[in-house]
């Protein structure tokens, strides 16, 4: 059972027999009863309810009693890998030999559609501009792209995100000429398919990063409120950059952030979450890009 996003993620998955669309009219407080009704209707032997399994259980919701725990206590209690926790929550046995690598499944039409955005004679870099929450956006991402374009003209940058990310794409980048801007222009599945084809993915904590985690594609992951342990511990070829606690003392907070302007300390320069704006200097990400780029030559 899932919504439109769930259908996109699970499309073509051979392990999924049937996808039941979530009824958006069901109130949150009645979800338990609704799922029990679906179990009976579809004659299911077992229910694994992932509602609030990670969100609220690990990422603390403002209504949670642990939301206001001191940071060190919060980290000690909740800095746990999401994939491992979902296995525990589902009462599935696992140990150090379990393969937690995520999987996506694309048909040939989707792969062909994604491939047409590549430039075969270039080093293709897929850049995710934002995540589901505004606090995940890295405000210097287009500046990073501009710097890369200035020093590495053979790099072709592909930017992806939702319609709101077009605002970021419109930032002036005079040295960035080898770029394809696709925010709001292509389906999420095509963005996810691209993570298997490009030379490098640069992304904050987003679905795009989890998609890249399915493949050995090198990836630079930017973390403000979350950590490498929580998100990408089981990914291969991942180069995590954690916000500097000296620059953003709140990071990592491991909290559910719905409204950064109410929940987060804000950067004076961008009026956005301090962990991403001030905690991750542009030069730090650029240096990591150069390191990964040179290693791949």
Region annotations inferred by a language model:
Residues 1-297:
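Catalytic machinery of carbohydrate-active enzymes
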